[in-house]
C-alpha cells in the first residue's frame, strides 16, 4: 500500500489496518516456514507496509491529529 493512500486514513483506520497487516505477516511467515509460500518477497512487502503504518501513526499522534 502506498504512503499517499495511508496518509488519507484516520488514526483509528490505521490502527485497524496495522492489526490486519500484522496478522497477514504472521500468516506469511508461517507459510514460508512450512514451504507453502511461493512468493517469498511478500513477507518483505508486508514488513515494509507495517513500518509505513507505524511511522504514520507516530507522526499523527505526535502532531495531535
Curated annotation (Swiss-Prot):
GO terms for biological process: translation. One of its GO terms (molecular function) is structural constituent of ribosome. Pfam families: Ribosomal_L29. The keyword Ribonucleoprotein applies. This is Large ribosomal subunit protein uL29. GO terms for cellular component: cytosolic large ribosomal subunit. The keyword Ribonucleoprotein applies. Keywords: Ribonucleoprotein, Ribosomal protein. Belongs to the universal ribosomal protein uL29 family. The gene is rpmC.
Amino acid at each position: 500500500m502506498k504512503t499517499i493512500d495511508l496518509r488519507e486514513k484516520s488514526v483509528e483506520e490505521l490502527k485497524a489496518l496495522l492489526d490486519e497487516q500484522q496478522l497477514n505477516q504472521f500468516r506469511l511467515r508461517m507459510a514460508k516456514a512450512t514451504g507453502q509460500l511461493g512468493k517469498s518477497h511478500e513477507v518483505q512487502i508486508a514488513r515494509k507496509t507495517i513500518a509505513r503504518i507505524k511511522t504514520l501513526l507516530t507522526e499523527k499522534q505526535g502532531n495531535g491529529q
